[in-house]
Amino acid sequence: MIHEGQLEVFDLTLIAKAPVFIGSGKSYVKKEYVFLTPRFARVSCDEVMLLDETKFFHLLLERKLEDKYTQFMLGAQTDLYRFLTAECCLSLNDIRAVSRYSIAAADALDAGHSLKEINAFVRGADGRVYVPGSSVKGALRTAILTDWILSDNSPHSAFGDTRKGFPEGTYLHTLKLKKDRNGAVLDDAVNSILRGLSISDSLPVSDTCMILAGKIDADPDGQTHRINLCRECIRPGTALHFKLTLDQSVLHQKITAESLMNSVRTFDSFYEKAYLRHFIAPRHAAEISYDSTLFLGGGVGFFSKTLTYPYLGEKDGLQAAINELNRSFRKHRHEEDRADGISPRTIKYALYEGELYPYGLCEVKLS
């Protein structure tokens, strides 16, 4: 830790215990990436290669292949590698020369050409993967508020019925920076105590630490359902490095390094007690310890992103969650969740090296 006046600067390390996905909003359809397998290419494992559009089109023009490529894009064939090698007579080295990056396909695609659209991970202007500090702060916010709510014995209103959302101002908007014309402190994000907590973006993540991962939903009885979805993810075991700064001129010791870690552990305990206990571990589930962990990024599920259950308790939280999910996903029959005692009634898993991992789980270390 470094002290700079009222600032306390810590090294924050998140170790991916499962595939982590933070989407850029971009995606690649089947005809926009090259799928390589050891059977057909000189690679050690299944691999996906993303092309640099500018370099690729220069190559097509140089080899006078633009008409063939147009026919390919309009036709039924979807295997870009086979098209480029068999019909365009390009070598693997030719293709690599116009690629942006390659990542391991892992368990997400197979040699049977079950090609899927790939959701891309966020990258910086230099093309390298990174984790935005705002994503980590959002995960810590959930842990902090879960801890504070569970420590608050005052009665809580059923916000799930009013549709007004969680009253975070009660817990967070405690500063006096913005007031109305009468001098009353406003319930406004400008007054959030979390202004005193900042997290840098992560150091860049190498493409060798990236994999493709699909999505598998698991029911309370352990039954699984594969979803036709594919994401660029950070590989389990990867360490992500950030700087976390606490401004005690704002926080006044309300949030400290010790209290942050306590909040993380409180969230873990509540997650296991209120949510995970309703589920039988599916077949091939990896052995996971929920100790000093956070759920980071996309695809981690409703419970990890919301405060419905800690605020309302399990009984009222169940009904509020059903109401909220019914409004957002009318076709999913969330009224049936009541019979399972939990809503939503699925846990989101990623398949990696033959085992199922809960999406986004990261171990937290502060030093």
Label every PLM stretch briefly:
Residues 1-367:
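Basic, Gly/Ser/Thr-rich N-terminal segments that form RNA-phosphate-binding interfaces in CRISPR RAMP
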